[in-house]
């Protein structure tokens, strides 16, 4: 299963549609709370995760969620997504396990 975590319903829908057409099992959730519930109960094969879940564009919410996910599922690969990226944020994401 591929887990999509993004507060933007259009992003969740488009990614889900494309992946399902490619025959992947997909679950999509809007935020950290729902994501952690899933990650605790099942190990996704891959996580596609937004970095921002509120109006803040710092990426801190995504980094926090990434660290929480890695506590429960350290071996699950995570791809971080954001419209507000920077080199520093990319480095922080890789250091946190993405």
What are the roles of these predicted feature ranges?
Residues 42-48, 52-53:
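Active-site beta3 strand of CheY-like receiver
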Residues 5-6, 29, 47:
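Conserved sequence signature across two-component system core domains
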Residues 37, 58-74, 92:
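Short amphipathic alpha-helix used as the core "switch/output" element in two-component signaling
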Residues 8, 52-57, 77:
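The short loop immediately C-terminal to the conserved phospho-acceptor aspartate in CheY-like receiver
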Residues 72, 84-85:
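Short, conserved "switch-loop" micro-motifs in signal-transduction and mechanochemical regulators
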Residues 9-27, 33:
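Two-component/phosphorelay signaling modules centered on CheY-like receiver
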Residues 24, 40-42, 68-75, 96:
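Conserved phosphotransfer cores of two-component systems
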């Amino acid at each position: 299963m591929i887990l999509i975590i993004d507060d933007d319903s259009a992003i969740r829908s488009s990614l889900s549609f494309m992946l399902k057409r490619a025959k992947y099992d997909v679950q999509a959730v809007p935020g950290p709370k729902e994501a952690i519930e899933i990650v605790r109960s099942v190990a996704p094969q891959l996580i596609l995760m937004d970095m921002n879940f509120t109006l803040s564009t710092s990426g801190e919410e995504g980094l926090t969620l990434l660290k929480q996910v890695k506590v429960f599922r350290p071996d699950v690969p995570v791809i971080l997504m954001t419209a507000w990226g920077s080199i520093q944020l990319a480095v922080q994401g890789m250091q946190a396990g993405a």
